[in-house]
């Protein structure tokens, strides 16, 4: 039996009234069941709750042992990059579109979450990527990503030229619109749209997926997650950027390299006991059903 939870954080950035309804339902239901509940500050303001315990994401990460994220995958990504630094488990209620990371159906969330609170769940450890934009001297600019790190032009889309080194060994040079470096978690996101492979969550692997390469021989490459990836630029005619989960942008200047590696942090994502990854793929991607 899994360890029971005692302190639960409610997280999310509500964009419409139905999401706020879910936040309020969760708060009142969990407090009625006797749990200590910390609600993210913005949600408490939106709901006009008074006399409640509120906190930032970091404070929830330090204090709670479970965070419930209400929203879509974008909300989950933003919260997860912070919560992954702490010893806290995370589960999501889907109020977005696809919801690869948010398992719970909002119409049945209370019953599904009740089962989880009784210990009827399992934990998946999802690793993050760390991207550093650095030069020979000076402090690097650092970002982390749950899904992917993307090299792309900063303003106007155009072809860029760069070299890729894996564990400091030259791998290939490329002329393309950019490069997606994806975790298994991100393999069903931007990487999939660019023709990248789907990596099951338990794989210790990273996918390198070219974006519109100017050669037919450029193909996605899957490497061990323990590898370090370095991107080098011989000359830069315009601003380039590294983006993390399409939420954090790090500009790249002349004479700077980009270093990408597996982060020391990981996300403790929990699922209901009846969760099946391949059922999720089938339903979200519209795969054909079983024939017999």
Curated annotation (Swiss-Prot):
Q: Which catalytic reaction applies to this protein?
A: NAD(+) + ATP = ADP + NADP(+) + H(+)
Q: Which cofactor does it need?
A: a divalent metal cation
Gene Ontology terms describing biological process: NAD metabolic process; NADP biosynthetic process
Where does the chain bind NAD(+)? 73-74, 147-148, 158, 175, 177, 188-193, 247
Primary site of residence: cytoplasm
User: What InterPro entries is this protein classified in?
Assistant: ATP-NAD_kinase_N (IPR017438), ATP-NAD_kinase_PpnK-typ_C (IPR017437), NAD/diacylglycerol_kinase_sf (IPR016064), NADK (IPR002504)
What terms describe the molecular function in GO for this protein?
ATP binding; metal ion binding; NAD binding; NAD+ kinase activity
Q: Which family does this protein fall into?
A: Belongs to the NAD kinase family.
Q: What is this protein called?
A: NAD kinase
């Amino acid at each position: 039996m899994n360890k029971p939870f005692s302190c639960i954080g409610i997280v999310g950035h509500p964009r419409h009234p139905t999401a706020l309804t879910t936040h309020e339902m969760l708060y009142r239901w969990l407090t009625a069941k006797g749990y200590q509940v910390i609600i993210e500050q913005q949600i408490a303001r939106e709901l006009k709750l008074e006399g409640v315990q509120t906190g930032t994401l970091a404070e929830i990460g330090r204090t709670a042992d479970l965070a419930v994220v209400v929203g879509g995958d974008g909300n989950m990504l933003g919260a997860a990059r912070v919560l992954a630094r702490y010893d806290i488990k995370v589960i999501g209620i889907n109020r977005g579109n696809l919801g690869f990371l948010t398992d719970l159906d909002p119409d049945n969330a209370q019953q599904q979450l009740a089962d989880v609170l009784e210990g009827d769940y399992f934990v998946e450890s999802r690793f993050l990527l760390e991207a550093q934009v650095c030069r020979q001297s000076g402090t690097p600019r650092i970002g982390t990503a749950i899904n992917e790190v993307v090299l792309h032009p900063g303003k106007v889309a155009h072809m860029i030229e760069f070299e890729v080194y894996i564990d400091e060994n030259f791998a290939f040079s490329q002329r393309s619109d950019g490069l997606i470096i994806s975790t298994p978690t991100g393999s069903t996101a931007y990487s999939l749209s660019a023709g990248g492979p789907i990596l099951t969550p338990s794989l210790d692997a990273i996918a390198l997926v070219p974006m519109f390469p100017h050669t037919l021989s450029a193909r996605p490459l899957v490497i061990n997650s323990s590898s370090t990836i370095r991107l080098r630029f011989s000359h830069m005619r315009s601003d380039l950027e590294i983006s993390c989960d399409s939420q954090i942008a790090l500009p790249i200047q002349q004479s700077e390299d980009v270093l990408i590696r597996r982060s020391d942090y990981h996300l403790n994502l929990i699922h209901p006991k009846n969760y099946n990854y391949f059922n999720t793929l089938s339903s979200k991607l519209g795969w054909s059903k079983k024939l017999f």
